[in-house]
Amino acid sequence: MSMNDPISDMLTRIRNAQMVGKDSVRMPASKMKKRIADILKEEGYIESISESVDEANHTTLELTLKYYQNKPVIEEIKRISTPGRRTYVGKAEIPSVYQGLGIAILSTSKGVISSRRALELGVGGELLCTVY
């Protein structure tokens, strides 16, 4: 089965795993998903990331989820730009997620970066998702 939006699939897997209290979540890997996972780890939303290759030579990402007082650290993870409706923002239009408590993840000319890093670099790009 082909997947139309792998990033939405990744975010949904994380959301569903946290709703049922799973320790980790596995998903097919890609460079974009790996970079998004790296940003989530850098910002403290997930515990760790591991990559593995199975017998069929398919790469899999495993994210260890993070909880605080038995509640998921990620309260909301939301896809903004979709394949059918791309959303682009300039450097002045980068949103402040929950008054700066959350982050947005953008795909820019400098790579996939967090909204904080995009503001430092002064670049805009495609608004992939928001995390709070």
UniProtKB/Swiss-Prot annotation:
The keyword Ribosomal protein applies. GO terms for molecular function: rRNA binding; structural constituent of ribosome. PROSITE patterns: RIBOSOMAL_S8. Keywords: Ribonucleoprotein, Ribosomal protein, RNA-binding, rRNA-binding. GO terms for biological process: translation. The keyword Ribosomal protein applies. InterPro entries: Ribosomal_uS8, Ribosomal_uS8_CS, Ribosomal_uS8_sf. One of its GO terms (cellular component) is ribosome. Pfam families: Ribosomal_S8. One of the primary rRNA binding proteins, it binds directly to 16S rRNA central domain where it helps coordinate assembly of the platform of the 30S subunit. Part of the 30S ribosomal subunit. Contacts proteins S5 and S12. Belongs to the universal ribosomal protein uS8 family. This is Small ribosomal subunit protein uS8. It comes from Magnetococcus marinus (strain ATCC BAA-1437 / JCM 17883 / MC-1). The gene is rpsH.
